[in-house]
C-alpha cells in the first residue's frame, strides 16, 4: 500500500516507509496507524507530525474562508461547522484522525431524523468539503468522509402546486411576516432562502421591479413586480436603512443557521394549521415523509399559473429562474415586455 510520508528528504522518506510497513503488518485501526506514523516521524526527524483537533481545524477553515467568500457562503460554513462540533461534543477536541466514516455516517443519520433528504445531503457535502480540505492540508492520511454516501431523495417527484383555495387557507393560518413571504414566494417564484434574504435594497419602487442574486445558483434576476405585490409593498414599513430585511425574523434565522431548514419546519407548522398536513407529519416524521406541499411548492405554483395563462415556456423559465448556474451565465434573456406580461398573469390572493 502506497502512502505519502509528507517529507521531501528521500532518505527520511524511505526510512519512514520501511518502518511504517514493518509496524503496520498486523491489523490496526486508522488511529493506531496514525500514532505509529507519528512516533516514527518524531524518532527519525525530531519533529512532530502536524496535527489538529476537529475544533481547531474547523475554526481555522472558517477563518481562512472569511475573506474569500460571500457572507452567505461563510454563514453556510460556520453553520455546518458549529452543528457538527456540537454533535461531536467532547470528541470535537480530539485529533482529526480520530474521526471515522462510522462517526460521519452516524451524524448523517442523526441529521436525517430532523431534516429532509436534500438538507441532509447538503450537510454530507459540507462535511466532505471539510475533511477533503484537511487531507489536502496534510492533517489526514485518509479522508473518512469520502466513504459516506448521500441519502436517497425522491421528494421532488411528489411535489405539486398549491390550489388557490389552499393558498387562501395558508394565508389565513400564517402571521403577517409569513403572509408576506408567501406573497413574495408566489409572485417571484424564488426559493425560501432567497425570500428570507431580501432587503429593501432589492426593491426598486421607481421601476416597479425586484433585483436579486439567487443563493443556490448565483443567477441574477430582475423581475417586474406584479400589481398584487406592488400593492402589498405599500403596506410595509421600509425604514431608513436600505439594507434592512423585508422579513426581519426570517432573515435573523437564516443568518444565524446558514440554512433555511428552520424556516422550512416553521412553514410546515403553518401547513398543519391550515389543514394541509397532519400533526404527525409536522413532527419527527417530517424528514422521512415525502410531502406534496412545502414552501418550494410556491415555485411550482408560480410556474403552473404562468403556463395556464399562456405565457411561453421560455419566458416562464426566465421569470422563475433556471436551476443550473451555467444556464444563460446568470442572466435572463426575455425582454422586459415579456416579463411584464408574465407578472400581469398572476392572480391576487
Report residues per predicted region:
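N-terminal DNA-binding recognition helix of tyrosine site-specific recombinases/integrases
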Residues: 72, 80-87, 94-109, 113-148, ...
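N-terminal DNA-binding module of tyrosine recombinases/phage integrases
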Residues: 3-94, 244
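C-terminal catalytic core of Y-nucleophile DNA break-rejoin enzymes
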Residues: 3, 171, 215-235, 241-270, ...
Amino acid at each position: 500500500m502506497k502512502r505519502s510520508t509528507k517529507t521531501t528528504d528521500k532518505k527520511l522518506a524511505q526510512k519512514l516507509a520501511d518502518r511504517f510497513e514493518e509496524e503496520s503488518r498486523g491489523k490496526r485501526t486508522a488511529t493506531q496507524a496514525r500514532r505509529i506514523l507519528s512516533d516514527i516521524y518524531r524518532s527519525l526527524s525530531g519533529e512532530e507530525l502536524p496535527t489538529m483537533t476537529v475544533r481547531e481545524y474547523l475554526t481555522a477553515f472558517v477563518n481562512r474562508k472569511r475573506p474569500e467568500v460571500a457572507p452567505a457562503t461563510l454563514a453556510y460554513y460556520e453553520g455546518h461547522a458549529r452543528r457538527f462540533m456540537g454533535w461531536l461534543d467532547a470528541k470535537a477536541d480530539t485529533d482529526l484522525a480520530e474521526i471515522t466514516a462510522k462517526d460521519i455516517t452516524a451524524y448523517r443519520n442523526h441529521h436525517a431524523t430532523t431534516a429532509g433528504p436534500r438538507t441532509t445531503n447538503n450537510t454530507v457535502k459540507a462535511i466532505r468539503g471539510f475533511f477533503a480540505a484537511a487531507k489536502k492540508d496534510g492533517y489526514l492520511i485518509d479522508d473518512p468522509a469520502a466513504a459516506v454516501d448521500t441519502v436517497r431523495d425522491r421528494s421532488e417527484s411528489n411535489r405539486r402546486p398549491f390550489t388557490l383555495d389552499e393558498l387562501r387557507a395558508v394565508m389565513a393560518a400564517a402571521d403577517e411576516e409569513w403572509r408576506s413571504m408567501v406573497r413574495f414566494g408566489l409572485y417571484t417564484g424564488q426559493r425560501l432562502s432567497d425570500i428570507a434574504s431580501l432587503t429593501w435594497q432589492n426593491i426598486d419602487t421607481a421601476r416597479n421591479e425586484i433585483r436579486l442574486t439567487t443563493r443556490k445558483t448565483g443567477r441574477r434576476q430582475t423581475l417586474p413586480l406584479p400589481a398584487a405585490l406592488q400593492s402589498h409593498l405599500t403596506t410595509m414599513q421600509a425604514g431608513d436603512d436600505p439594507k434592512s430585511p423585508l422579513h426581519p425574523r426570517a432573515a435573523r434565522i437564516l443568518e444565524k443557521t446558514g440554512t433555511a431548514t428552520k424556516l422550512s419546519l416553521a412553514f410546515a407548522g403553518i401547513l398543519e394549521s391550515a389543514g394541509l398536513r397532519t400533526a404527525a407529519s409536522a413532527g419527527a416524521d417530517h424528514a422521512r415523509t415525502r410531502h406534496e406541499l412545502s414552501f418550494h411548492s410556491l415555485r411550482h405554483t408560480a410556474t403552473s399559473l404562468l403556463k395556464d395563462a399562456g405565457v411561453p415556456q421560455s419566458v416562464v423559465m426566465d421569470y422563475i429562474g433556471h436551476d443550473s448556474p451555467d444556464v444563460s451565465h446568470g442572466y435572463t434573456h426575455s425582454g422586459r415586455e415579456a416579463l411584464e406580461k408574465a407578472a400581469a398573469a398572476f392572480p391576487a390572493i
